[in-house]
């Protein structure tokens, strides 16, 4: 107890703050070394290398990695820690565009629509907008299936999957599309987080390069690597049963195959049940199985794959998922946060804007207890502006520690 109190009063570098250290210009060794001295003088325990918009030194290139090595050597000399960050900005997984240069690894989603893409107008094609990670209809997808839909009093009274060339009324279409390219992803696209092969490619261009450069310090000077806001195409819904609009849901090339193998039935045969309620209070088992299977596909492909690599290389996987606070927000962007935490050696959360997301903190804490982890990372203090004073900083840390 005496040692615990002493550590609490005068924490070692392992238990001091380690801010996101923005690398956002043409990197200079002299400038970086000077900044590490400032961080040490401020009493911080280390720093998290965080690439931001404006970085003018090629990401993960020889010069960049050479500077990382020098920073790690300096931190070791100063008794500080370096925490790696796995991406050029966020969300993690696209490897600064190096992963998604290959179409095989680009994000994918299912577009469910009343509009046939061969005949739809440009206005209809532009109807959905948003970030590339969230998904956007482009009208160039591969046809998966067509359905004849019958609605009664706002419920899905009947539906059937049409055979090739078969006619019908009130036809809806299902297409598989690739995530569009975007300047945010260095003129590439976001990654297919449902594909383990894409995550392995992400490891090749990121984690393996860090291993080659500073791997001897994994588990020592470098305790962990931070993954930030991985997600899939955000799920969309119809505003009302009779609405005629495009709806996007996460999907990938072999989803039908793995769904059939897991549940013994076709997902595409029953796809309309994901979007409309069944009559007479019936519950759609297909809808439940879709959300469950999607959650497992994502967790296995991303966090489990990264965590396994990290564990075998003596470095902890930490970071946080996207949209953590509520069951609704989680369902839309990642299915469920707690299933992903099993892959993290140090589960983490995001607490921006001085918010009080008690559910976010408690679910990560709960997962850590259940898995026998003894730490939880919190990304805090961010997006609080320059007038956020020391009292605010202390309060934000204190209430999380008190939980």
Briefly describe each language-model feature range.
Residues 18-30, 385-388:
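Active-site mouth loops of central-metabolism enzymes
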Residues 17-21, 47-49, 82-85, 223, ...:
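Hydrophobic faces of well-ordered beta-strands that scaffold small-molecule active sites
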Residues 31-52, 70-74, 81, 309, ...:
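Catalytic domains of carbohydrate-active enzymes, especially glycoside hydrolases
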